[in-house]
Amino acid sequence: MALQDVCKWQSPDTQGPSPHLPRAGGWAVPRGCDPQTFLQIHGPRLAHGTTTLAFRFRHGVIAAADTRSSCGSYVACPASCKVIPVHQHLLGTTSGTSADCATWYRVLQRELRLRELREGQLPSVASAAKLLSAMMSQYRGLDLCVATALCGWDRSGPELFYVYSDGTRLQGDIFSVGSGSPYAYGVLDRGYRYDMSTQEAYALARCAVAHATHRDAYSGGSVDLFHVRESGWEHVSRSDACVLYVELQKLLEPEPEEDASHAHPEPATAHRAAEDRELSVGPGEVTPGDSRMPAGTETV
C-alpha cells in the first residue's frame, strides 16, 4: 500500500472551511500542507495595535498602558491588563501577540524564581532583561512577536529596559511601544523630567496614553497606571481613557480674551495728558501751576 493511500492524499477533500476565518475564498487548508505555513502565506493580514509606555524618574519607574486588545477591526477585550507583574519589584509591559507575551512572562517568572532560590536573592533588572533576551533570540524568525519594557527597582535603584523578541535589549529612561507610541512620545518628550514629583509623573503618564488612545484606532478602553518603588510595585489607578481625554482638553482650553480696549490700553504721553487737562478745565478757569496765575497767589 502506497504512502499516499495511507495518508489519503488522493481522496476527495472533505475538510470544510475554518469557522474562525472569513468564508470568502474558502479557507480550507490543503491536504499535506502545514496549516501555520499555509495561513502565513495565504491568510488574512490582521492589524494589531496597543499603547504602552514606561519612564524612569527619581521616585521609581512609571508604567502605563491602554486596555484594548484588538485583532484587526475586532476588539477582543476592552479591559485587558497589559502590565504584568513578574515579582514584587519587577513589572513588564506587553505589546505584540497576547499569547506570546503571556507565555514568555510565565517562563521569565519561573526562571527568576529558580535563580532566587539558588542564589538567595532576586536577580537584578539587567539580569532579567538579559535572560529574557537570550531565551527569545533562539526563536528568531519563527513569527514570535513580543515587545516589552521591564520596569523594576534593584540594588542600583530604578531601572528600565526594552526587550524585543529578536534579542534586542536596550536601556533607557523613556520607552513607548505599540501603534500609539508616536503620539505618546510627543507628550513624553515635552513634559518628561527626571526630577519631577510623583503626582507630575502620574499626570504625564495618563496624559500620554489618553492622547494616544484618542488618535490611534487600535488603542482605547482605559488607562492602567503602575508605579514601581523601592518597596515594590503598586497599581495606582485605572481611568477611562475617553473621560480622561475630555478632562485634559478642558484644562488646556484658553481663557476668554478680555476687551481689546482693556487688554491693549493706549500708552499715555505728555501731549495726551495735556489735552486731557485742558478738556477737564473750563476756558476761563486757571489751574495750579498755570503760567497765567499771578506770582504769590495761594490756592484754597
Swiss-Prot record:
Its EC number is 3.4.25.1. Signal peptide: none annotated. The proteasome is a multicatalytic proteinase complex which is characterized by its ability to cleave peptides with Arg, Phe, Tyr, Leu, and Glu adjacent to the leaving group at neutral or slightly basic pH. The proteasome has an ATP-dependent proteolytic activity. Incorporated instead of PSMB5 or PSMB8, this unit reduces the chymotrypsin-like activity of the proteasome. Plays a pivotal role in development of CD8-positive T cells. Residues 1-23, 255-300 are annotated as: Disordered. It comes from the Eukaryota. It catalyses: Cleavage of peptide bonds with very broad specificity. GO terms for biological process: CD8-positive, alpha-beta T cell differentiation; proteasome-mediated ubiquitin-dependent protein catabolic process; proteolysis; T cell differentiation in thymus. This is Proteasome subunit beta type-11. InterPro entries: Ntn_hydrolases_N (IPR029055), Pept_T1A_subB (IPR000243), Proteasome_bsu_CS (IPR016050), Proteasome_sua/b (IPR001353), Proteasome_suB-type (IPR023333). GO terms for cellular component: cytosol; nucleus; proteasome core complex, beta-subunit complex. Keywords: Cytoplasm, Hydrolase, Nucleus, Protease, Proteasome, Threonine protease, Zymogen. It comes from Homo sapiens. GO terms for molecular function: endopeptidase activity; peptidase activity; threonine-type endopeptidase activity. Residues 1-49 form a propeptide. The 26S proteasome consists of a 20S proteasome core and two 19S regulatory subunits. The 20S proteasome core is composed of 28 subunits that are arranged in four stacked rings, resulting in a barrel-shaped structure. The two end rings are each formed by seven alpha subunits, and the two central rings are each formed by seven beta subunits. The catalytic chamber with the active sites is on the inside of the barrel. Incorporated instead of PSMB5 and PSMB8. The active site is at T50. Pfam families: Proteasome. It is found in: Cytoplasm; Nucleus. Belongs to the peptidase T1B family.
